């Protein structure tokens, strides 16, 4: 599983979360009085990059400290109503640790709910598949299992049907048994990813 990281990196991620929340609050306050109703219809797509913190555990190996690295998100789907969108979301994380490439990901069926027609804030949740892989040369440790996601975001309009959309997402995966070069390795593996991603969306 992942090696132990420094608490400084976790503090940096916490600072990014606070900054994203403050920016969202400020945008909401400015827009509440004069923002026009938002229109969601048909096909939509969005994606972007950011930063994330991963923690993991398994039976007999305990829990690791968080590791921070580059993170990304891609989502697409259709419109159920002006305030409810359905889609598929892929959340990923990557870091090279001492020559070993570590990747974490979730692929989920997701729902996005806008509590208000005139505000860009939305909540999201979904379920699907989670995966982990660590690779160094020909050696590979990997595992796959059930995954869940949850989070929130805010659409800041930049055009008729486009928006700048910062998002905070928490993903969880129950990977079960890990495999090392095809042979059973650690059991009871679980992982979480907390990410802040800055995306562009087209509705």
Predicted feature descriptions by range:
Residues 2-4, 61-62, 156-158, 172:
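Short, aromatic- and cysteine-enriched interfacial helices/patches
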Residues 32-34, 51-55, 70-168, 172, ...:
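Gram-negative (and chloroplast) outer-membrane scaffold detector with strong preference
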Residues 33-68, 173-177, 181-203:
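Outer-membrane pore/translocation modules
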């Amino acid at each position: 599983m992942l090696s132990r990281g420094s608490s400084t990196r976790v503090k940096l991620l916490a600072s990014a979360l606070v900054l994203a929340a403050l920016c969202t609050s400020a945008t909401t306050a400015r827009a509440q009085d004069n923002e026009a109703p938002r229109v969601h219809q048909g096909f939509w797509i969005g994606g972007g990059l950011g930063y994330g913190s991963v923690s993991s555990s398994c039976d007999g190996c305990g829990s690791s400290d968080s590791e921070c690295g580059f993170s990304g998100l891609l989502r697409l789907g259709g419109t159920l109503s002006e305030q409810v969108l359905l889609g598929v979301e892929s959340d990923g994380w990557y870091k090279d640790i001492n020559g070993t490439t570590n990747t974490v990901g979730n692929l989920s069926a997701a729902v996005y709910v806008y509590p208000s027609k005139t505000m860009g804030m939305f909540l999201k949740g979904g379920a699907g598949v989670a995966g982990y892989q660590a690779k160094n040369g020909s050696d590979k440790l990997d595992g796959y299992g059930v995954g869940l996601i949850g989070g929130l975001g805010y659409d800041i309009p930049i055009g008729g049907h486009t928006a700048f959309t910062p998002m905070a997402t928490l993903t969880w995966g129950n990977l079960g048994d890990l495999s090392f070069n095809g042979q059973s390795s650690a059991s009871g593996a679980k992982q979480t990813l907390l990410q802040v991603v800055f995306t562009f969306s087209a509705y």
